[in-house]
Structures are given as C-alpha cells and as structure tokens.
Amino acid sequence: MSALLEATGLTRRYGHVTALDDVSVHLAAGERVAVVGESGSGKSTLARLLLALDTPDAGTVALDGRPVRPGSARSTRWFRRRVQTVPQDPGRSFNPRMRVGDAVAEPLACLRVHGDHSARVAELLVAVGLEPDAARRWPHEFSGGQRQRLAIARALAPRPDVLVADEPVSALDVVVRLQVVELLAQLSAAEGLALLVVSHDLGVVQHLCDRVLVLDAGRVVEQGPVGEVFGAPAHPVTARLLDAVPTLAAVVS
C-alpha cells in the first residue's frame, strides 16, 4: 500500500536531550497503526511532529507526498482539513462556555468551511452514539466517555483522511475505554479512516490496530503486524509492556 501520511528520519532534540532519533513511520489509507512505548520513549513527541505542531531538527513529514511543517493557520489549512486529532483528556478540550453543537462544528469554522453546519453536527452526534439534541447542551452535562465521543465527532467534522489519537482512552475507566475503542474501529471501517494511535495500553492496540511500532529512548526498536510483534516479542521493552496489566484484555476475557 502507498503511504498517505509519511514521516522519514524524524529527530527532535530539546537542549541536550534527544527525544526522537531518526524515526520513520508511514500510514496508508484506512490503515490502523499504533505507536507504543514506556513513559518518556518519545511517543507524544512523534505525535506532535506528525500533526505539524512541532518542528523536527531533522527529517520530514508529508501527506500524499506533499511536505508539511508548522506554520500559520492559512499555510497549514490544507493539512488540517485532512489530518485531525483526538485529545487525551476530553474534559479539558472543550470550551465550557460553548454549547456542544458549536464545539463540534468549530473545526469547520476554523478551516473556513462556510455554511450551516447543523445537519453535519447532527449526523456526527448520531455517528458517535449520541442524540442530535445533545448539540444544545453544555460540556459539563456529559460524562467522560460521552465527552470523548464528542471529541471524536469534532475531529471527524471536516471529513479527514487521518486521525491521530494520543492516549485517546487513558482518562477513562476500563469499561468506557472498550466502548470508545470499538467506536473508533467502527468509524475507521465505515469512513475508510486511517488511524495512528499512541498508547501505553497494549489492550487498546490489540483490539484496534493492524500494525505496531515500539519506541524506546526515542528510537524504533521493533515493528510489524500486531499479532506477530505481541506473539513473539523480539525486544525487552516489548516484553515488559506485554507483562503489564492488560486493561482491555482483562475486560474482554
């Protein structure tokens, strides 16, 4: 499969600390790829670079072969229309003074998509398992799991090709995590949406992703199909992650 979103040789340093060291990753249309690793391995740094929210010291990020770097809202608008993100903490990602319908439609306004977005908002709310009249309510009226569904709806508003999710369920309880993971899988299949999921929870990865990259100290130490990597880990970091408590696997089993 040809790459839709591709990063080549990404390196990012903060002072004397190398957070990411010559990392390459590609994502094809409709593919679901996970980036896993222990705390401080460089996962979130990679996500920020792939979202053009930070500038690498070396390497490139390209969408359909077109390079992208951080810049003004106008210069990156083409990229933002096609690549969106789901936040780690949905509670902090919504303006408490903005009704949910306006919040879900906010990316469309920011990306200069003109018109009445009420029909699109209603469609998105139904797609994530909420009622259309939720648009009139306020963020604080929803549970954590419902707010994450709203965050997913907001990310889908401009009909992106790629969704980057950095620890998308870590702030949720175990049962709600499974519900949100299943929702992401369903939406990815229905929309042909490519997913890049950053997670330390291998249960999430096993249920959602096709392929996995394992990071350690800013480098890719192992990668391949999820079943192969998790079935016979070749690196000690992967083995340690697999030995950790599998939050979702425990629920499913």
Feature-to-residue mapping (PLM):
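Conserved ABC ATPase signature
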Residues: 138-142, 146
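ABC ATPase NBD coupling module
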Residues: 68-84, 98, 102, 110, ...
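Conserved ABC transporter NBD signature motif
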Residues: 59-70
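ABC ATPase "signature
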Residues: 223-224
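Helix-to-loop junction immediately C-terminal to a conserved catalytic motif
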Residues: 51
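Conserved ABC ATPase "signature" region
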Residues: 116-133, 242-243
